[in-house]
Amino acid sequence: MAEKNNANIGFEKQIWDAACVLWGHIPAAEYRKVIIGLIFLRYISSAFERKYNELVTEGEGFEEDRDEYLGENIFFVPEKARWSTVAAAAHTPEIGTVLDEAMREIEAENKSLKNVLPKNYASPDLDKRVLGDVVDLFTNMDMSDTEEGKDLLGRTYEYCIAQFAAYEGVKGGEFYTPSSIVKTIVAILKPFNNCRVYDPCCGSGGMFVQSVKFIQAHSGNRQSISVYGQESNADTWKMAKMNMAIRGIDADFGPYQADTFFNDLHANLRADFIMANPPFNLSNWGQDKLQDDVRWKYETPPAGNANYAWIQHMIHHLAPNGKIGLVLANGALSTQSSGEGEIRKNIINADLVEGIVALPTQLFYSVTIPVTLWFISKNKKQKGKTLFIDARKMGYMVDRKHRDFTDEDIQKLADTFEAFQNGTLEDVKGFCAVADLQTIEKQDYILTPGRYVGIEEQEEDSEPFDEKMARLTSELSDMFAKSHELEAEIRKKLGAIGYEI
């Protein structure tokens, strides 16, 4: 049986249910910060306490030695910030002050978190009785299953944003990239030791978490990766800093949040790998003030859509052998409006597009438009060729609204790319095809995978039409007869209790 990704949202739903206790007791603008701060504190305290108890059992007296924790990438938590201290104060009037002090202690312990953690728990707007109830709920949660490999903060926050959007009647933002998409990008790009990884719109930092995990899984050194990110939203930037702190990843997100187009915090960076999920079809991004920008090598992107601004920004930041994996709305594959078709043509003719993967719908919690993975390379192994994959039928339904990839799905996509790069891939009707530049030119430089992979071959139906219709008609007649029998039985039962129909 195919191994499924950690797609179920049971833990996130527990968090959301706990958060709902606070609904109506705190201003909406502060709501998310309060919950995320509690998640962060509960998470790092749980990891710390497990190690602390191990050291106590060993009896060597090292349980307060910071190096014992830092050596295993476990966050050292000062006594006043430990969850046991918070839990003990849950039903006292001072619970807000205790939480604020815990956050200050954590920031003092880790300078990179200065002014990052929320410290609004003592606010008079927050009902302390209700806050204590939420602390109790967090205390009683089983955190044993939240190992480092899960992008807990990002998944939980993204889930909560979708819920907020549903309640408020507005669209949830593209805050977080689902783990199956991140894993697919990383599995195809294969980041290596001593590499520089960059995300110009990093959200909660999930791309970096998965890159580190990939390197570890392939016997690499997690400390050898250099992480660079930028985020324009202040709360999201803080979220990313917290996410990296939890996992012991040393990241450069700049000294503050900033707009990537107007204030490039890593202007001189040339990255080995760039992974990103930029905001889809962003309009009014400030093109009029960036007309002659050095990044627009393949023509200036239009004011009404930033898709090709993101692509060119990333190409600009690539090292000579660098690679990009990014998520874009499907419109970028075929649009001809406002000069976008010309930009796409120029990028294709520069032989930068290595592969395009059409993804299934419903992979995101809160975004329903179809999306595509783009893979761009400065030094392609297969010169003058591009791989097209139609993965729209892959994956499985987690529930009625959400789809995910299995690990086997992700491996199949990665293996297909590797075979293409090695020159051993054979086209598979309806799934994958390799096209040269001349073929793409004949398609007017449109990159929609369906134009190249064709339609999946169907097994020939050997049953003659007349025989099939006779069989199906007979089966339908039997079903109708059974339906009439059931209807008569139901009428009889209802009549027996005085309800004639």
List each language-model region with its residue ranges:
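Non-catalytic, mostly N-terminal accessory regions of nucleic-acid modification and defense proteins
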Residues: 1-193, 252-260, 265, 358-361, ...
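Conserved Class I SAM-dependent methyltransferase catalytic core
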Residues: 14, 21, 31, 35-43, ...
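Short, contiguous acidic/charged loop-to-helix segments that flank catalytic cores in large enzymes
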Residues: 25, 285-305, 331-340, 360-365, ...
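Hydrophobic alpha-helical scaffolding
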Residues: 124, 146, 201, 229-233, ...
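Conserved S-adenosyl-L-methionine
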Residues: 171-276, 281-297, 328-331, 339-353, ...
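Hydrophobic alpha-helix feature that most strongly marks membrane-spanning transmembrane helices
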Residues: 216, 245, 249, 279, ...
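Active-site lining segments that contact anionic ligands and/or coordinate catalytic metals
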Residues: 270-271, 305-307, 321-323, 327-329, ...
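C-terminal, active-site-flanking charged/polar segments
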Residues: 352-353, 363-366, 370-415
